[in-house]
Amino acid sequence: MPVVKVRENEPFDVALRRFKRSCEKAGILSEVRRREHYEKPTTVRKRAKAAAQKRHAKKLARENARRVRLY
């Protein structure tokens, strides 16, 4: 859990902003959303496989775009 120590003469808004940023970096909100509802292991694997295929297609598209030069 991110801990933010409020400095002397520091406005509350600034400390809150630092806390939110540290939570975002730690990935707490995304973890909470992911664990909000139970997801079957098959669904997890299926989603991970779909994400991997999407990443691969994106990588291939980038490589093909780099090869094709429009003159």
Curated annotation (Swiss-Prot):
GO annotations of cellular component type: ribonucleoprotein complex; ribosome
Biased amino acid composition, Basic residues: 43-59
Protein name listed in UniProt: Small ribosomal subunit protein bS21
Ranges of biased composition (kind: Basic and acidic residues): 60-71
Pfam families found in the cross-reference section: Ribosomal_S21
PANTHER family associated with the record: MITOCHONDRIAL 28S RIBOSOMAL PROTEIN S21 (PTHR21109), SMALL RIBOSOMAL SUBUNIT PROTEIN BS21 (PTHR21109:SF22)
GO BP terms, alphabetized: translation
Gene from which this protein is expressed: rpsU
MF (Gene Ontology): structural constituent of ribosome
Assigned protein family: Belongs to the bacterial ribosomal protein bS21 family.
Species annotation: Vibrio cholerae serotype O1 (strain ATCC 39315 / El Tor Inaba N16961)
Cystine pairs: none
Region entry Disordered, spans: 39-71
Keywords, in A-Z order: Ribonucleoprotein, Ribosomal protein
Keyword Ribosomal protein: yes
